[in-house]
UniProtKB/Swiss-Prot annotation:
Membrane topology reported for the UniProt record: Single-pass membrane protein
TM annotation in the entry: 7-27
Subcellular location(s) per record: Plastid membrane
Originating gene: psaJ
Gene Ontology terms: cellular component: photosystem I; plastid membrane; thylakoid membrane
Gene3D superfamilies: Single helix bin
InterPro entries tied to this protein: PSI_PsaJ, PSI_PsaJ_sf
Role noted for this protein: May help in the organization of the PsaE and PsaF subunits.
Keyword list, A-Z: Membrane, Photosynthesis, Photosystem I, Plastid, Transmembrane, Transmembrane helix
Organism encoding this protein: Cuscuta exaltata (Tall dodder)
Protein name listed in UniProt: Photosystem I reaction center subunit IX
One Pfam match: PSI_PsaJ
Length: 42
Protein backbone atom coordinates (compact mmCIF):
# COMPACT_ATOMS: atom_id res chain seq x y z
CA UNK A 1 0.00 0.00 0.00
CA UNK A 2 2.91 2.35 0.69
CA UNK A 3 4.21 1.89 -2.84
CA UNK A 4 0.75 2.66 -4.23
CA UNK A 5 0.64 5.92 -2.24
CA UNK A 6 4.09 6.79 -3.56
CA UNK A 7 2.87 6.14 -7.10
CA UNK A 8 -0.20 8.32 -6.63
CA UNK A 9 1.92 11.20 -5.35
CA UNK A 10 4.15 11.14 -8.43
CA UNK A 11 4.13 14.28 -10.56
CA UNK A 12 2.73 12.75 -13.81
CA UNK A 13 -0.17 11.15 -11.95
CA UNK A 14 -0.99 14.32 -10.04
CA UNK A 15 -0.76 16.49 -13.15
CA UNK A 16 -2.99 14.09 -15.10
CA UNK A 17 -5.61 14.13 -12.35
CA UNK A 18 -5.39 17.91 -12.03
CA UNK A 19 -5.67 18.55 -15.77
CA UNK A 20 -8.54 16.07 -16.06
CA UNK A 21 -10.45 17.78 -13.26
CA UNK A 22 -9.77 21.21 -14.75
CA UNK A 23 -10.92 20.10 -18.20
CA UNK A 24 -14.09 18.62 -16.73
CA UNK A 25 -14.77 21.81 -14.82
CA UNK A 26 -14.30 23.94 -17.92
CA UNK A 27 -16.57 21.65 -19.94
CA UNK A 28 -19.31 21.87 -17.32
CA UNK A 29 -18.99 25.67 -17.08
CA UNK A 30 -19.27 25.94 -20.86
CA UNK A 31 -22.28 23.62 -20.81
CA UNK A 32 -24.19 25.78 -18.34
CA UNK A 33 -22.82 29.17 -19.47
CA UNK A 34 -22.04 28.99 -23.20
CA UNK A 35 -20.14 31.83 -24.90
CA UNK A 36 -18.60 33.04 -21.64
CA UNK A 37 -16.24 35.31 -23.58
CA UNK A 38 -19.13 37.72 -24.14
CA UNK A 39 -19.81 38.21 -20.39
CA UNK A 40 -17.25 41.02 -19.79
CA UNK A 41 -18.88 43.16 -22.48
CA UNK A 42 -22.28 43.42 -20.77
Amino acid sequence: MRDFKTYLSAAPVLSTLWLGALAGLLIEINRFFPDALTFPFF
